[in-house]
Curated annotation (Swiss-Prot):
HAMAP family: NrdI. GO terms for molecular function: FMN binding. The gene is nrdI. One of its GO terms (biological process) is protein modification process. InterPro entries: Flavoprotein-like_sf, RNR_Ib_NrdI_bac, RNR_NrdI. Disulfide bonds: none annotated. It holds the Pfam family Flavodoxin_NdrI. This is Protein NrdI. Probably involved in ribonucleotide reductase function. Belongs to the NrdI family. The lineage of its organism: Bacteria, Bacillati, Bacillota, Bacilli, Lactobacillales.
Amino acid sequence: MAELIIVYFSSKSNNTHRFVQKLGLPAQRIPVDNRPLEVSTHYLLIVPTYAAGGSDAKGAVSKQVIRFLNNPNNRKHCKGVISSGNTNFGDTFALAGPIISQKLQVPLLHQFELLGTATDVKKVQAIFARLKHHTHDKQKQTNNLITERTHPCHKPMRHTSH
């Protein structure tokens, strides 16, 4: 199977971290400090939302996530985004997800509140499994295509004149 991991950001409150731990899936955390993280495999991004609510969407995506996604290599491996938020903030609930989805042109796969529920955990595990299977199928198709084009028995046909 093609490798797929969870990449996530969690502030010092660790709400997102606790949610990711419940998933029981391979994961890498975007550092809270300024240390860079570079990912070389496909991943599903899980991020919290930081926004004041109402019409104030400033800062919805954390600086650490922005810095991570400013790396072209990291951007190209993102296969989808999941975001968390607090429904008390109304229109800005889980807003980081739609923002990142639009910027990266990847699907917004799920949104959940705070620590998430058992149902959220099951949904994200199912999304991960489907995405991993889909990524595997695409990789298999690509490998078959490469094999078909580069196999030594596949030589160009020569035209001979009589």
